[in-house]
């Protein structure tokens, strides 16, 4: 997870809330036959997976409590054997929580009432040091819940979870 310096260009100027974005990529050796890297941005399936992962993760974060920080969750698939969307959401959640914890510890992510104004920042304002309890409380405010995903399908009339590629390909419903 990378915390960017600013918010996306399309965000309102002087926004007080943050944004979570996801990027998803199958590495060339992640499938049985070599998968060619996508050029010039994500295409159909990849773009839709990125949107699903980002929406899922934004659902676990209070973007106002996060503050004006843009974060990108990178989902690099090393071994694609079914369930890559679910793995991206679950692992992305863990990585996002750890990144938020680091931002809080560094003073970049502060409770709303402790944030410096734009003028304060220009004047060289120093963020306050939070106690360990204040850091834990703010982490809970920013990310009160975790999110995880699990694939479910109906294969030969039986409900199955965590489908691999073969089961997913043969599922009646997934």
Predicted segments with their positions:
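Polyanion-binding surfaces on beta-sheet-dominated domains and ring/shell assemblies
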Residues: 1-174
